[in-house]
């Protein structure tokens, strides 16, 4: 494989920020509940067995093995009675022993199923955008979706982290941690950050492939991390 000279490539300091389970987290915070420890899903037509799951908390995903998109009838419990659904379990190849049934029913009883409130999500998103503007100019902030976007911190990195003994990679990590902290303090929402001292694409790849699985919820992919 030929050698690629990345020193000729443009470089920027990128923080690609994703709000963890955004809709579900907003609903948890509005109820004074911990967004990572509460079993909650946002469902259209929440009183109906055909309701569409629009978002779910990390705990909901862990317990019921469901992603953000699905139907109420795919759950291992009946949405109305909160009783174990043997039919759904067998259809999906899930266990039906008494311990598993009790486990699912116990969690089903405390699981919150709530309707979507887009006005709330937009309001929290605007609050997060204002936090971003504390660290970069509007021209350096690029919304990707309602719960995700990146900030080009190239021009502001040394201003916020002036320590000359630190590398730009270390500075980017410190500043990204500060952004995470501010989002959590002001909104109660946890965020994940894919960082790159190269370009937004590598920041996005770091976010999707590594940051979501690290204790700090941050990861950095730059040119030196790309195979030649």
What residues fall within each predicted segment?
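Gly/Gly-Pro- and Ser/Thr-rich, intrinsically disordered tail segments characteristic of DNA damage-repair
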Residues: 1-228
């Amino acid at each position: 494989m030929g050698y690629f000279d990345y020193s000729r490539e443009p470089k920027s300091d990128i923080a690609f920020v994703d709000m963890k389970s955004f809709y579900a987290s907003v609903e948890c915070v509005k109820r004074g509940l911990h967004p990572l420890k509460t079993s909650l899903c946002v469902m259209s037509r929440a009183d109906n067995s055909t309701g569409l799951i629009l978002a779910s908390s990390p705990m909901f995903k862990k317990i019921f093995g469901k992603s953000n998109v699905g139907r109420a009838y795919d759950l291992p419990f009946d949405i109305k009675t909160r009783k174990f659904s043997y039919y759904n379990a067998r259809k999906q190849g899930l266990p039906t022993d008494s311990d598993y049934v009790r486990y699912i029913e116990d969690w089903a009883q405390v699981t919150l199923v709530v309707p979507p409130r887009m006005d709330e999500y937009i309001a929290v998103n605007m609050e997060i955008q204002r936090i971003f503007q504390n660290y970069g100019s509007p021209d350096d902030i690029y919304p990707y979706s309602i719960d995700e976007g990146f900030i080009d911190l190239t021009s502001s990195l040394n201003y916020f982290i002036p320590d000359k003994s630190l590398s730009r990679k270390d500075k980017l990590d410190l500043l990204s941690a500060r952004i995470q902290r501010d989002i959590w303090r002001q909104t109660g929402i946890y965020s994940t950050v894919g960082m790159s001292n190269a370009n937004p694409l590598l920041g996005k790849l770091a976010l999707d492939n590594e940051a979501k699985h690290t204790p700090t919820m941050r990861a950095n992919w730059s040119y030196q991390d790309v195979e030649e």
